[in-house]
Design a protein with these regions (language model features):
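RNA/tRNA-interacting regions in translation and RNA-turnover enzymes
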Residues: 1-235
Length: 235
């Protein structure tokens, strides 16, 4: 999905927190606006702590009325959910689409540790969940064969989807694979379209991550990508 990533937290069945992804550790508080979105349940029949990751998006139809002001549905959703005026935000018909559960998730006394089951349980609680397909794939070629089907699904969808993520359904196995400096090893991201932009390289800087690993960052003349000015990128 192409929108703004955020996390919702429920405690005792009540929505208590909503934050953007931010820098990965600390996000921006958007609870005042999330509470006015009809697509987000304010109460759920689940009393344990529950943190849900998802995306704030705008459908193509709802974006039509604002296309002269905002360049893309993504920029529209990102700007609207940050408004100080919740009444204005409520008029913009944003939608939250859930795609993962971060905290342990239980069905009665047994932990749910399969992603497909987590998403089905969220759907039963009236959340909108990301479209997904369960498949058995033993080779990379099997992944590639699914891409055209997923692209077709994206084209038929009512909101922007710019790629797909392949994840292990067994969450415990996925966690056992660990992570790199940039991403978890249990997932493979695929972008549908490769946009090419002409720019000039100005410099290469080095940044140090939390584990001490150095990452080169390209600094280049600004280019406009989906309405956003970009002048840096990790190599």
């Amino acid at each position: 999905m192409d929108g703004l990533t955020c996390s919702l937290t429920y405690e005792g069945g009540e929505l208590v927190s909503a934050e953007t992804r931010g820098n990965g550790l600390v996000g921006e508080n958007i609870l005042h606006n999330v509470k006015v979105l009809p697509s987000i349940p304010k109460k759920i029949p689940y009393l344990k702590k529950l943190t849900i990751d998802g995306e704030i998006i705008c459908t193509y139809k709802d974006f039509e009325n604002f296309s002269e002001i905002y360049s893309t549905p993504r920029n529209f959703a990102s700007g609207s959910i940050r408004l100080l005026d919740s009444k204005e935000c409520s008029k913009r018909k944003l939608t939250f689409v859930a795609w993962d559960v971060i905290t342990p998730f239980y069905d009665d006394y047994q932990e749910i540790d399969f992603l497909s089951e987590k998403l089905r349980n969220l759907r039963n609680m009236s959340f909108t969940v990301v479209p997904f397909i369960r498949a058995t794939m033993k080779e990379v070629s099997h992944v590639e064969s699914f891409i055209s089907d997923i692209q077709w699904m994206a084209e038929e969808c009512s909101y922007p989807i710019d790629g797909a993520v392949f994840k292990f359904n067994d969450c415990a196995y996925g966690r056992s694979l660990g992570e790199t400096e940039h991403h978890f090893k249990n997932a493979l991201a695929y972008k549908f379209y490769d946009d090419v932009f002409l720019t000039s390289l100005l410099d290469i800087e080095w940044t140090m991550g939390r584990t001490g690993a150095l990452t080169p960052v390209a600094v280049f003349t600004p280019v406009n990508i989906d309405g956003t000015e970009v002048n840096r990128a990790s190599l």
